[in-house]
Amino acid sequence: MILAAGFSSRMKAFKPLLPVGGKPMVQRCIDLFLDNGITDIVVVTGHYREHIEPVIRDAGACPVFHPGFASGMLGSIQQGIAKIRPGQTGFFLLPTDIPAIRPATVARMIKKFQSDPHRIIMPCFNDMPGHPPLIPCEFKDRILALKESSTLRDLMTAQKDRTVNLKFHDRGILMDADNQDGYRRVESKVRSLDIPDREECLSIVDQELPKKHPIRDHLAQVAMTALKLAHAVSGPVNVDLVIAAALLHDIRRMEKNHAAAGAELLQGLGFNRVAKVVGQHMNIALDPQAPVRETELVYFADKVCNGPHLDLNYHQRFRHCLEKMPWAANSIWKRYENTRHIQARIEACAGQSITDILAD
């Protein structure tokens, strides 16, 4: 159930029809559920219904008009719940001004609900609850019985023992387009949903690494170094992708073949482009005819960071590795040659030396 009945008074424009990522906000919310195989989608309308309802129908959902929409959100929720068909086991509840949620988030909530269909599934980011909750239909009558002075939040707060707080690395569950600033943030977020932002990367790091693990400092240094490289080179470099991949490149450092293990983790979270970069930060296939890309920048930044410190004398470190592990000479030599070639490519592209690029 999607709520789109309000006046959008703080926005000074009708939010559900504002464009987000090239489509109306309400359509993006509808697509979030259609992409997960949910076809029974109700959108509660009120203000501006004559304009929004055709958009809702064209997007594949069913508009339900709430005549008393001016009285507040609870009435709209009750109007939508009354339209839930018998036999349904649960429903999502999403205000239309929260459109920057990843489809993978909804998919995981569905999977959890299927194994535990009598509990409310509440998505959380950094321990903060967000949207959309997935509510068992057995709560339907209780919601319909709520008085006008009550809120759905009151009912759900009273059901803490029947609520599963499910952690996600998805800040979009907290982001609403309630005003112009919020709208701009949501618009920016939607443009790069397949790349975790800095807070989401740190959420992943917190899940995977102990608080004071030394790899954390290395990740931060590699990210800072890769960012400087990205700003120095010209061409089609996605800076957000560079930062995310750098912050996460050693996320599974303690595992055998940690690059592949890290890539597998990130693919499972829906971050395929980041996974591709992380998966190549140890062994990379170079194309000398192509522009310098994100994969090379993260690869090189990793090689010039010795633990938490920038150390441009990677030549000495590779020699030490050869002495320490002569049985791995072929792979070590290949990585060294790749590092040298990438340095030359970056310097040619930037028109300055690596020393100058990475100077404080």
Language model features with spans:
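A short, N-terminal amphipathic alpha-helix
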Residues: 25-40, 79-83, 225-232
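Conserved beta-loop-beta/alpha segment of the NTase-like Rossmann-fold superfamily
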Residues: 70-141
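N-terminal glycine-rich phosphate-binding loop and ensuing alpha1 helix
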Residues: 1-46, 50
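Divalent metal-dependent catalytic cores for phosphoryl transfer on phosphate-bearing substrates
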Residues: 209, 230-327
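Active-site flanking loop/helix segments enriched in acidic
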Residues: 198-218, 223, 245-251
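Conserved alpha/beta core of the MobA/IspD/sugar-nucleotide pyrophosphorylase nucleotidyltransferase superfamily
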Residues: 147-200
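Charged phosphate-binding loop/patch that engages nucleotide di/tri-phosphates or the phosphate backbone
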Residues: 173-176, 188, 328-360
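Conserved donor nucleotide-binding strand/loop of the catalytic core
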Residues: 58-71
